[in-house]
């Protein structure tokens, strides 16, 4: 039986709904699965319930986005089974607001460069707590402007 300690769902930038992720884990023999969506614990309670139903041990978690001022780059911190997840909410909320503002600017830029609508992007972000680059790229792929998820267009976004 295997373990996966870093899994994203549609609550953040994953493309698969939570229940389907857990069902696939069970089908593939994953005995323990950590749900670590970006900057949200929104699916954790549901994941614990679904894990019991599918026979998969769920580790609730979150991948917290952070900055590394010393290197001038981004860092992601995985937090597993937080004892007091509510204490993470102020940090998560601040990050979510910041991401939302940045993605609004990105969406505006993409809509100037390509004839796609905000609705196309929002449709791809349905079920997520925010819009991510993957959602924008999925909309561009749907419209035929990108051929692959992490190719040239993704790098330019």
Question: Where would I find each of the regions flagged by the language model?
Answer:
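An N-terminally biased module of ancient metal coordination in phosphate/nucleic-acid-related enzymes
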Residues: 1-74
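Extended substrate/RNA-proximal surfaces in nucleic-acid metabolism proteins
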Residues: 52-157
């Amino acid at each position: 039986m295997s373990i996966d300690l870093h899994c994203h769902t549609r609550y953040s930038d994953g493309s698969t709904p939570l229940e389907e992720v857990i069902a696939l884990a069970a089908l593939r023999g994953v005995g323990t699965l950590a749900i670590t969506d970006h900057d949200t614990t929104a699916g954790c309670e549901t994941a614990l319930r679904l894990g019991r139903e599918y026979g998969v041990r769920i580790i609730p978690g979150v991948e917290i986005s952070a900055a590394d001022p010393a290197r001038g780059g981004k860092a992601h911190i995985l937090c597993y089974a937080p004892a007091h997840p509510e204490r993470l909410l102020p940090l998560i909320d601040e990050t979510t607001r910041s991401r939302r503002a940045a993605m609004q600017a990105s969406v505006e830029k993409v809509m100037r460069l390509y004839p796609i609508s905000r609705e196309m992007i929002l449709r791809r972000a349905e079920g997520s707590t925010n819009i991510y680059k993957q959602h924008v790229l999925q909309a561009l792929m749907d419209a035929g402007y990108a051929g692959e998820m992490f190719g040239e267009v993704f790098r330019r976004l």
